[in-house]
């Protein structure tokens, strides 16, 4: 059973936006409505331009989304911005499920090296993008 807290924080100790759950849901929806089509457009643009056995469209959106989230965290974005842009936009832009599916598809196609490469590159590049963006925004912002 999850207990409700009344101190302005969510059940996982993250600050919530003033106005409660309805405002948070609206912010996530707004961010998601922007992130999902951006994901689709980036994926299609990359896939149309580069022919590769690696799923470079998914890799690109995951790296970009990780960098955006890292920038928000590094800049100490406020609650509403982190909810809309971090959870909503970046959540819709990035895609772990497609990453998993495409990796399994590579395995079932017998492309084991590409599958391993996809996992290593995706994780390393996404974590690296977060780290770089946090570092950059910490350096740029006082």
Swiss-Prot record:
It is a multi-pass membrane protein. GO terms for biological process: cellular detoxification of fluoride. The chain crosses the membrane at residues 23-43, 54-74, 79-99, 116-136. One of its GO terms (molecular function) is fluoride channel activity. It is found in: Cell membrane. Na(+) is not transported, but it plays an essential structural role and its presence is essential for fluoride channel function. One of its GO terms (cellular component) is plasma membrane. It holds the Pfam family CRCB. It catalyses: fluoride(in) = fluoride(out). Keywords: Cell membrane, Ion channel, Ion transport, Membrane, Metal-binding, Sodium, Transmembrane, Transmembrane helix, Transport. The keyword Membrane applies. Na(+) binds at residues 91, 94. Belongs to the fluoride channel Fluc/FEX (TC 1.A.43) family. Fluoride-specific ion channel. Important for reducing fluoride concentration in the cell, thus reducing its toxicity. PANTHER family: FLUORIDE EXPORT PROTEIN 1-RELATED. This is Fluoride-specific ion channel FluC 1. It comes from Nocardia farcinica (strain IFM 10152).
């Amino acid at each position: 059973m999850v207990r409700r807290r009344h101190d302005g924080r969510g059940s996982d100790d993250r600050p919530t936006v003033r106005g409660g759950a309805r405002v948070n849901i609206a912010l996530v929806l707004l961010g998601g409505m922007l992130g999902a089509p951006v994901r689709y457009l980036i994926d299609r643009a990359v896939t149309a331009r580069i022919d590769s056995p690696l799923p470079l469209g998914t890799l690109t959106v995951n790296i970009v989304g990780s960098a955006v989230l890292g920038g928000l965290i590094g800049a100490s974005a406020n609650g509403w911005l982190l909810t809309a842009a971090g959870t909503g936009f970046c959540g819709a832009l990035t895609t772990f499920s497609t990453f998993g599916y495409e990796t399994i598809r590579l395995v079932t196609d017998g492309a084991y090296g590409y599958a391993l490469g996809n996992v290593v590159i995706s994780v390393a590049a996404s974590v690296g993008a977060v780290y770089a963006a946090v570092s950059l925004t910490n350096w740029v912002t006082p």
